[in-house]
Amino acid sequence: MARFISKRKDGKDKDKDKKANRPLFKRRKFCRFTAEGIKTVDYKDIELLKDFINENGKIIPARITGTKSRYQRQLSTAVERARFLALLPYTDLH
């Protein structure tokens, strides 16, 4: 019995395309604040805040960092306060 192979219009195999787009290893996300036992996020801890800000100066979303929603809210207010006091830049141009 012949096996039917699914092909696209351009002749490439669909299954190979799916495997090629899949990442090799996906890191498990965890809340860094819970793991380190941090109760509140401090706006004066610049080294910690820089880990959650991308190169453009935007706050990285919780779905990417794995931060719990409680700490993500604290993180965003801490970044806003640090920006207001000129401890962190608003954008990458400053």
UniProtKB/Swiss-Prot annotation:
Gene Ontology CC, one term: cytosolic small ribosomal subunit
Keyword Translocase listed: no
UniProt region (Disordered), positions on chain: 1-21
Keywords, sorted A to Z: Ribonucleoprotein, Ribosomal protein, RNA-binding, rRNA-binding
Family matches, as Pfam families: Ribosomal_S18
GO molecular function, one term: structural constituent of ribosome
Subunit details: Part of the 30S ribosomal subunit. Forms a tight heterodimer with protein bS6.
HAMAP family the record matches: Ribosomal_bS18
Family membership: Belongs to the bacterial ribosomal protein bS18 family.
NCBIfam families, per the entry: S18
Role noted for this protein: Binds as a heterodimer with protein bS6 to the central domain of the 16S rRNA, where it helps stabilize the platform of the 30S subunit.
Protein name, entry field: Small ribosomal subunit protein bS18
Organism encoding this protein: Nitrosospira multiformis (strain ATCC 25196 / NCIMB 11849 / C 71)
Higher taxonomy: Bacteria, Pseudomonadati, Pseudomonadota, Betaproteobacteria, Nitrosomonadales
